[in-house]
């Protein structure tokens, strides 16, 4: 197989997998040889080879076969030496250009995700569900001595995690213009890591990330299951902590609940301050709507919003803040276009689809299924007679959630739990209420299940 043939195979793969996948996962491959139905490739890391094997092996085999070089399997090996032309190899991609000596990371290399100018502390509405997270973020933004490291913010979609991280970055840049503050998503961290591997600039990557004063990584759950990225993240984390540099992390769940995240990383993340942004309550939703409405009154001068509309929306739209703000944006835009006052009737007509989605009722059957999945028990045990602690406690959790999240009466809930008496349901509900005060794991379980059911 000639170099020209491999170039043609690569061109076919580009069309098949798309440019982003090609640049990230196919372009770095170096075909070292093809013999007895086995294509051998050199890859930057074992993780890289495993990923290509799982996601692109079929495409590569198909293109090689079409080019007249049928293969049965692919093999990947990591080379610790710089790439150079190998005369003995039957087919080889053009050699990569040699790695360049890299100076200290310049300021322009410290580019992360763009910060949203709207996401400041002034625009963040504080209420009971997020007051601790807000206070902790304010403390970090003051830029004083590092008191907790990392600050770990977690919660469901649209509860303010990203807003607070942007606000911290904005404040730090104002207070300390010379500080090296880097904010980016975990996906961007992985992409830049893979890019550094591909370009043989991993030392520059390490130097860049370990030279920052504040590292902020959003949605860290993204790196779960990605072994090489987790390895680099772990060492970057340790290096910054050793230098007493501030780290701020966010995720959609607590560190201990992130599946496939290495235990040593979970342990590190739990060493600092872990703060939950709880689902919004009525008062917080109303405050957010009032702030947003004040902003729109400036934009749409002369537009009138009737009494009770904001209260109605705060009661009805309980999913997350993004949906809530989006509903108000649509309402003001619609009223402006048609030249009408924003009344309750107009809101109901204009937002009918959002209101219908928000009206989705949680059923007892859904609760039983989610709780059974969470505790890894059979669904039939929810209504069965078994009294083992490993079954009885999840059953009581489901009873408690049925009482909290559905309008069903205790006798009706009892019937859905295998015909149990209403006093049994009441006992289960009270037992969970008592345990919540002392059992933090149970409280976390309930918070997670509630979010899953109301998502």
Swiss-Prot record:
Residues 70-113 are annotated as: Domain II. InterPro entries: AAA+_ATPase (IPR003593), Chromosome_initiator_DnaA (IPR001957), Chromosome_initiator_DnaA-like (IPR020591), Chromosome_initiator_DnaA_CS (IPR018312), DnaA_C (IPR013159), DnaA_dom (IPR013317), DnaA_N_dom (IPR024633), DnaA_N_sf (IPR038454). Residues 87-109 are annotated as: Disordered. Residues 1-70 are annotated as: Domain I, interacts with DnaA modulators. Keywords: ATP-binding, Cytoplasm, DNA replication, DNA-binding, Lipid-binding, Nucleotide-binding. Oligomerizes as a right-handed, spiral filament on DNA at oriC. This is Chromosomal replication initiator protein DnaA. It comes from Cereibacter sphaeroides (strain ATCC 17023 / DSM 158 / JCM 6121 / CCUG 31486 / LMG 2827 / NBRC 12203 / NCIMB 8253 / ATH 2.4.1.) (Rhodobacter sphaeroides).
